[in-house]
């Protein structure tokens, strides 16, 4: 997996090799380029079948999330959530660990923030699962979803000074 800089929110800096993303104060108006309000970036490779997984190293502070998003989220012009803009993710926000979709937040209590997260996608089963990669322990699995034949992209959100996500 590599990050697609053309999908990066203006407040995010993607490394030249496409392996990491970090937060930086905006040099331009984020709404001017048709980006949503979320400081996120997508992976270059779209997934339409099979199983795949990737690991990321995350910072223990700040706010970040990792997961997958439908192709329709790739270039959205509006900031409101609709069923066409689905995502399945997990992350840290204000010290609380969450499982997040476009429509809901599920608090994950008694979870120690992992150093590395493994995202696992089974396209045919519609399954997205997250693991503590160091402990090889399951953190959360979303109920089966239908991806409706659309491409699914790795999705990364970084939201605060000092937050960074690096692909392993």
Question: Residue locations for each model-derived region?
Answer:
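Beta-rich ligand-recognition domains in immune and ubiquitin systems
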Residues: 1-168
């Amino acid at each position: 997996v590599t990050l697609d800089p053309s999908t990066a929110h203006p407040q995010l800096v993607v490394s030249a090799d496409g392996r990491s993303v970090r937060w930086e104060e905006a040099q331009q108006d984020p709404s001017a380029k048709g980006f949503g309000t979320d400081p996120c970036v997508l992976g270059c490779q779209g997934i339409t079948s099979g199983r795949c997984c990737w690991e990321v190293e995350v910072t223990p502070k700040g706010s970040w999330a990792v997961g997958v998003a439908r192709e329709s989220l790739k270039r959205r012009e509006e900031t409101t959530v609709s069923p066409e803009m689905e995502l399945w993710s997990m992350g840290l926000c204000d010290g609380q660990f969450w499982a997040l979709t476009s429509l809901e937040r599920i608090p994950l209590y008694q979870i120690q923030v992992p150093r590395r997260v493994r995202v696992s996608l089974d396209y045919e089963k519609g399954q997205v699962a997250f693991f503590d990669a160091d402990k090889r322990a399951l953190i959360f699995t979303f109920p089966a979803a239908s991806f409706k034949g659309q491409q699914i992209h790795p999705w990364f959100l970084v939201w605060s000074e000092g937050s960074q996500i690096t692909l392993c």
